[in-house]
From Swiss-Prot:
Organism: Mus musculus
Gene: Rbm27
Compartment(s) of residence: Cytoplasm; Nucleus speckle
Protein name, as recorded: RNA-binding protein 27
GO molecular function: RNA binding; zinc ion binding
Alphabetized PROSITE patterns for the sequence: RRM, ZF_C3H1
Main location: cytoplasm
Amino acid sequence: MLIEDVDALKSWLAKLLEPICDADPSALANYVVALVKKDKPEKELKAFCADQLDVFLQKETSGFVDKLFESLYTKNYLPPLEPVKPEPKPLVQEKEEIKEEVFQEPAEEERDTRKKKYPSPQKSRSESSERRTREKKREDGKWRDYERYYERNELYREKYDWRRGRSKSRSKSRGLSRSRSRSRGRSKDRDPNRNVEHRERSKFKSERNDLESSYVPVSAPPPSSSEQYSSGAQSIPSTVTVIAPAHHSENTTESWSNYYNNHSSSNSFGRNPPPKRRCRDYDERGFCVLGDLCQFDHGNDPLVVDEVALPSMIPFPPPPPGLPPPPPPGMLMPPMPGPGPGPGPGPGPGPGPGPGPGHSMRLPVPQGHGQPPPSVVLPIPRPPISQSSLINSRDQPGTSAVPNLAPVGARLPPPLPQNLLYTVSERQPMYSREHGAAASERLQLGTPPPLLAARLVPPRNLMGSSIGYHTSVSSPTPLVPDTYEPDGYNPEAPSITSSGRSQYRQFFSRAQTQRPNLIGLTSGDMDANPRAANIVIQTEPPVPVSVNSNVTRVVLEPESRKRAISGLEGPLTKKPWLGKQGNNNQSKPGFLRKNHYTNTKLEVKKIPQELNNITKLNEHFSKFGTIVNIQVAFKGDPEAALIQYLTNEEARKAISSTEAVLNNRFIRVLWHRENNEQPALQSSAQILLQQQHTLSHLSQQHHSLPQHLHPQQVMVTQSSPSSVHGGIQKMMGKPQTSGAYVLNKVPVKHRLGHASTNQSDTSHLLNQTGGSSGEDCPVFSTPGHPKTIYSSSNLKAPSKLCSGSKSHDVQEVLKKKQEAMKLQQDMRKKKQEMLEKQIECQKMLISKLEKNKNMKPEERANIMKTLKELGEKISQLKDELKTSSTVSTPSKVKTKTEAQKELLDTELDLHKRLSSGEDTTELRKKLSQLQVEAARLGILPVGRGKTISSQGRGRGRGRGRGRGSLNHMVVDHRPKALPGGGFIEEEKDELLQHFSATNQASKFKDRRLQISWHKPKVPSISTETEEEEVKEEETETSDLFLHDDDDEDEDEYESRSWRR
């Protein structure tokens, strides 16, 4: 269903729902609107709404739904329309606006006529008018683009420019003088602010004119106008650059002079200030070194060049005595293009590299002419400039941060030390907008063409779109400490924010510096959006900078975007701004991931022995949660205990409690750390060595350790043995008791078996203590080292210990399981007996009821009640017996699987021992025991227990490489002997070597041997044992001489002949 005004409907619904519903009316109103918006027929929608709203409104549902749909048709939820009365004030201001624009046009015409009265000597009147026509066309196109952009961002800009106190939205006032129809359309929004703007602008203009008229160099009599600004030009040692917002196109930036020319024609008093005269230097020489601070007119489209070329173009005077010399010209500056035009490397047309046409600047800077520099002009000494006077100068009439030079509204960042220069970071080319007749005229006059403007911007990873002031100071000026401390954030005067008292927050003394050159101070930053209005001062040392060098930027920003700054003397921040280009978020503080704690155990130490019992500890620690386990005398310490809670939160409550444990402030509560939680801060070499060493579990008494063991070799463990690194076999056995010792730091020689005496000591120690501990040992297997390190003599004792302890563990596990099974059987027996007794009792009561028919009703009711209870108990017992029988079956299966796993592990160990050439006697015994156990459990078929496929010359299944004694558990009737003929008795030994060394079994010394399968006669019962012994001897003898490869080939040969 279509809704005309959703907000009005929501507010109407909220008022309607408030008295009839307990839920939040606004939320429910949103829900109702969402229901009504569904695309359904009216009847279905009504039923659907009633169904959905029944939960909230209950009885009121039907009435509310009817009222809702009625209002949707009648639209009575819409507020009554009030007749809009035209306000007289906007009309008056609109008239005033028209007057201003009409007034401005004659003013511009008058200024043009005045310019025509004073033509320059080298220019004709026709050329001047031609140039003005071209400039006017360009300006019109320029402002069309500018206004088109600002139409989209008007609301965003108006919201912040007013608060930030920039230039009261320069684009709006500029739009008033440029587009009459557009201004009339939007005049209602801006009219209340117009009088303030006009008053401030006229005040600003008058102050500026006063300053300009009063300017006279100190060291010379008042010269003519041309001498005045030409001589002042040569004494300019530093530059200040203001960058236009990043979104402006190539032809949008304006100089201060242009800004004030455009907007000074009308003011609140309705009078026009006298027009400015043309700048003679600019007309004759093609540039003016005063730039936008010149009190004479440079026209609507002045020449723009970069200040970085000043040192090479104008020979500056030497610094006053006592000051360091300026850096050599051109340092850290890109090479400037020559006078001839040429294609630049960037995407835009124009000569040479430089900032792109999308971001241009206004910087009138002179070309070099080779004339000698004039005398140094020093201003009258003044007190140091404070930051408040620099920033708030516009709001204080009659004051100027830079006397006789800067317009009062120029908000300058504080100057920086000499050795901090700028780099040019834009890479797009830009071309001068002066071409055609004016350019050819300049070439004829011998004046150099305009240079390119280089735009200084912060790296893109610094602040995203936050582009602002970039100040370059190249004057040799000393630092004067500043005593100004900024107060809280003032949007009219944002202060420098830094992590400490940075050395850059120091200002210059007017008595010790030359007059600063404020060439090209434009208003391009004044009405950018607030993200583009942050002032950034980027400084770099005057040496070639690498990416990792310390680079400092001072940021003037609102409080919400402040960042700490590292000084040159301090370390870089965690994420330096010059780190990864293109990542705008990298200077933001990172967020720590929340650790998910799982520890539930607490260690309690220094408990008095009389208090270290379960009752006392439970009395205190049960206040904080459910205790799962309490161990007193933990790790054999009579003053320690271990408390385990159900959850980590409960343990945290206990450890963070301020209450004294057992009213004793000396008792300490700590988190219990398991062995695997210890930080593994080991290098890869240490980890490799740790994989090689033996983890052997010794007895609980520390005094039983031999004296030759270093104390560091003993480490107390509390956790059960866990899996060891990569190559060490997983340990299986009973959990380790607290207080057991582990030989964890055995020297390398002991581990690798180089020193047999030390190894024998260790093995002796293991033999002494390992048997009683019942713990298992890891198998020596390290694939990272050659097998030659291990000798069977050095490893015999530990291997014996391992095999013995493992079989002992298996027996203990089986014993425990048998005991558990026995207990289950006893319980089942008792339940069965109880069931039988209850059934007998039930039968007795039933017979009693049948016999005594004349029984009282009360007794009858009691007997019936008892019978009912007995029936319930009987059924319950039967269910329990059924479940116990089903549970007992899986336990048997589990036992089988464990036994099978143990059997497979033992076979794997045997393979490894055989491949490394170790003694396998103990392991074979253990394997035979496990096979018997497996046969008893039904894992292996009785009489088919040949699982040692690795020994001897196994056929078919998993043939191994080992050579050892055979344990025949399977009767194999395949023939294993070959009767041979065609040789003499003396050649028997050679024949055996021939069989073992070559595969040519049928030929021997160029003779063909007679070989056939040996078919033994069926022996009688009495001689069966003897024949088996003979067979074993034959096989063992042949195994001694046969190698692995021949064994495989022979098997293949045999299998082929067997198929025949």
